[in-house]
Amino acid sequence: MILIIDNYDSFTYNLAQCVGELGYDVLVCRNDEIDIPTIKQLNPNKIIISPGPGKPSDSGISLDVISSFSDSIPILGVCLGHQSIGYLNGGRIIKVSEIMHGKTSKIYHNNEDLFKTLPNPFIATRYHSLIIDNLNFPSSLAITAWTENNIIMACRHKDNQMLRGIQFHPESLWTFYGQQLLRNFLEYS
């Protein structure tokens, strides 16, 4: 079962639908309607931290989920979930110079892990006003994808490689290869 922590975002159920279309059972729980003991009892195979409004400190249980399970359960943070990973690892979350709401960008990547079967670059849709600052990027994380302007689009923990984040939205219709990226996370983590 794949657990999706919903940070009160309208895209969460699109994300759940994409995961379901790949043949996985999905459970969606709001970030203030579940606790760590319940998640332990559910024993999910993977966890996805959804997009959402606000900043990582507004993401309910999401930060605790990352802290509690990133060494035992593969976790993918999407948008706010990605920023939460950066924040927990000491990164600074800053406003992006151009707000990206429904805009597409070319995403360049390291051809590994989540991206190993994707073209380089590929087109992805972005919906965000915050990013992980690349000038003060945490040494515990590796940048795995970026834009042509060097805005961080994905990261992975260097030691705990089950923890990954992506800034863009794989569930968007305008993100080419988004479902393949999700498949890579679900099948190869």
From Swiss-Prot:
Regions annotated as coiled coil: none
Protein's cellular compartments: Plastid, Chloroplast
Organism, scientific name: Pyropia yezoensis (Susabi-nori)
Domain called Glutamine amidotransferase type-1: residue spans: 1-189
Residues holding L-glutamine: 52-54, 83, 129-130
GO CC annotation, single: chloroplast
Gene expressing this chain: trpG
PANTHER family in UniProt: MULTIFUNCTIONAL TRYPTOPHAN BIOSYNTHESIS PROTEIN, MULTIFUNCTIONAL TRYPTOPHAN BIOSYNTHESIS PROTEIN-RELATED
SUPFAM superfamilies from the UniProt entry: Class I glutamine amidotransferase-like
Protein name: Anthranilate synthase component 2
UniProt keyword annotations, A-Z: Amino-acid biosynthesis, Aromatic amino acid biosynthesis, Chloroplast, Glutamine amidotransferase, Lyase, Plastid, Tryptophan biosynthesis
Other observations noted: Component I catalyzes the formation of anthranilate using ammonia rather than glutamine, whereas component II provides glutamine amidotransferase activity.
Record: active site: 79 (nucleophile), 169, 171
GO molecular function, one term: anthranilate synthase activity
Pathway: Amino-acid biosynthesis; L-tryptophan biosynthesis; L-tryptophan from chorismate: step 1/5
Quaternary structure note: Tetramer of two components I and two components II.
